[in-house]
Amino acid sequence: MNLNRRVMGSTGTSSDDPPRGLSFSAVPGDQLHTPGAKLVPWIRAAIVASLLVMLFGAFVRASLSGDGCGTSWPFCNGGSLLPDTSVLKSVIEFTHRATSGLLLLFLAGLYVASRRVFPARHDVRAGLLLAVVACIVSALIGMILVRFGWVVLDRSVGRAITMPIHLVNNLVLLAGLVWAQHRAAGGAVSKWKGQGPLGQAFTMSVISVFLLCMTGALSAMGKTAFSVEKAMTNSLTERIQMHIGEGAHWILRGGALHPLLATSFGIMLVLCVNLMMTRRPEAGVKKWGQYTIGIFLVQMAFGLVNLIASAPWFMQLGHLLLALLNWMALIMTGVYALRVTASDSAVVEPVEADVAPAPRPVYAGIISDYIALTKPRVISLLLFTTLLAMFIAQQGMPPLGLILAVMVGGYMAAGAANTFNMVVERDLDVAMERTC
């Protein structure tokens, strides 16, 4: 593709066409004339089907049906082709396996169809192939969970490691489908590398969502593995004590990080998305950026209600659905924010200078910028007063590990707060037209 001309879609659709409605496509449905236009509704159907299969998988876990087929896989209870219909959890587990298999066949069929329409190395083919591979990996993870008995009330380390990986893999599957649908509909080409602050903001957003979803998966596992103990609690205070009190299981302690990290990572996500909307104030970026922030705020409120209500299965599914929708909105925000424009490929003539400035080393620049943002002199004063209070409370020297944790963690927290404050103040200045 010649990037020195205006970037066009698959049939010449301008990448500057604004998105409309709630569709993931770059142009309205009645204007789709790309070679892959016939694939677009099928890819959208695959997105919906994937969401349903993922939600049903969460229902399998929440309903304690993961052992419905015993340790047999892919068949049920020792090789039976069909489950015992008199046992509800066997029907639930087998239905999830069957629908997952049908989804894999559907995705594989879409990939084969895309090979007939799009040339090699096209984004649609790459996105669908990524979805197929992720679906296969998801099936293998399911096999591991069943074969090792890491289901229902199991509290093993293996399950605690596998469940977060399972959810992140599902996010990758959805990302591949969303990207393939966008490009099949004539959406603009996007480039992650070499995008400066835009690429860095999108990278930080993706990492934040990954980490948040991983702790969320651990929290959901704890709700299942300790469902008997949770049912014996009578109040929110008892449930909180069960998670963070003395003698609390490490899985529950890890799950308790989820609502705490949701706040910090949520701030990071909002700031990064806002940066993308500010740096590239175009219709597509604003639309999907607003969706990303809006869905996340709804998800936060929903999660709080979920916590107070002791996380019934239907609210767990609702919380997961919001997380998946938020992820897809973030992907679309990045797609539009990182799109390749004509100016990106413009040839810049070199300007001769008498003395070329010496380039500043990359790491030296990062360290210098970090110090400027975090204001270490101010933080040092705060840490000194904190450390003094620790010595007074201990009536002597506190444990070395505690000192290191407070000093390092305090510096990072205060530095991040300073950075956020400067970014917010800058955005306020721009909004109030006090600066250029």
Where are these regions (language model features)?
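N-terminal signal-anchor transmembrane alpha helix
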Residues: 38-65, 208-219
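Extracytosolic (periplasmic/ER-lumenal) interhelical loops and adjacent juxtamembrane/interface segments
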Residues: 62-94, 225-251
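Hydrophobic cores of alpha-helical transmembrane segments in multi-pass inner/ER membrane proteins
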Residues: 102-109, 168-184, 264-271, 324-339
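Membrane-interfacial catalytic/cofactor-binding modules of polytopic membrane enzymes
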Residues: 214-265, 270, 274-277
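Membrane-embedded alpha-helical segments that form the functional core of polytopic membrane enzymes
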Residues: 45-48, 287-288, 294, 384-386, ...
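Interfacial helix-loop-helix junctions of multi-pass membrane proteins
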Residues: 60-71, 140-164, 219-230, 301-324
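Individual transmembrane alpha-helix segments
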Residues: 84-106, 248-263
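Acidic (Asp/Glu-rich) catalytic motifs at the cytosolic membrane interface
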Residues: 56, 60, 96, 414-436
